A protein has these predicted regions:
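C-terminal nucleotide
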Residues: 54-179
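Gly/Ser-rich oxyanion-binding loop with an adjacent helix/lid
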Residues: 1-72
């Protein structure tokens, strides 16, 4: 979020207009190339595209998104955000290694399935259908399999969360968030 703030300020004082996707991709490039974190664009997309009283449903594969408004069936709610006092630095964590483990799993799965694949750097689990994972997961080293299982479970959780929000099931959505 600091990079988005700095970028917004630099654009404002220099009379530069960046559309939302340019803002997101420029911030991502700064994180990747200057901070040294091999992050995607989820955080930057949330910071740029989010809107009050809406859930941001984002597909980072094709950059499509949907702002799902509050459903009239929802009970009134308040969301509190606070600083826990805990700080973490992705640069000094195993984040980049975990991302490489996910790429390795995707690359292997694509190879096992005879799928066309790109370079290792451009390989993502998002490009591997769940059915391919299910068919070949036992060929993966345990660590890669666990990383892929986590990815697919989170993908499924995001889908379920968006559907619960659309229905106005805030209680179900809240339970899903805390799983």
């Amino acid at each position: 979020s600091v990079i988005i703030c700095f970028l917004s300020a630099l654009c404002k004082v220099n009379g530069i207009h960046l559309d939302p996707m340019e803002m997101i991709m420029t911030a991502k490039a700064a994180e990747n190339q200057y901070v040294g974190v091999s992050c995607g664009k989820l955080d930057q997309s949330c910071e740029v595209l989010s809107k009050k009283d809406h859930l941001l449903y984002l597909d980072t594969k094709d950059d499509s998104y949907e702002l799902i408004s509050v459903n009239e069936n929802m009970k009134p709610y308040k969301i509190a955000i606070f600083f826990s006092g805990l700080e973490r630095s992705l640069k000094n964590s195993k984040y980049n290694l975990r991302q490489d483990e996910c790429k390795a799993a995707a690359y292997a799965l694509m190879g096992y399935a005879g799928m066309n694949y790109d370079t290792f750097a451009n390989t993502r689990l998002r490009d591997v259908p769940f059915e391919v994972f299910e068919a070949y997961k036992n060929r993966l080293p345990e660590l890669w399999r666990r990383r892929a299982e986590h990815y697919y479970s989170e993908f499924d959780r995001a889908e379920k969360g968006a559907n619960l929000w659309r229905k106005g099931d805030l209680e179900g959505y809240g339970q899903l968030v805390f799983e």
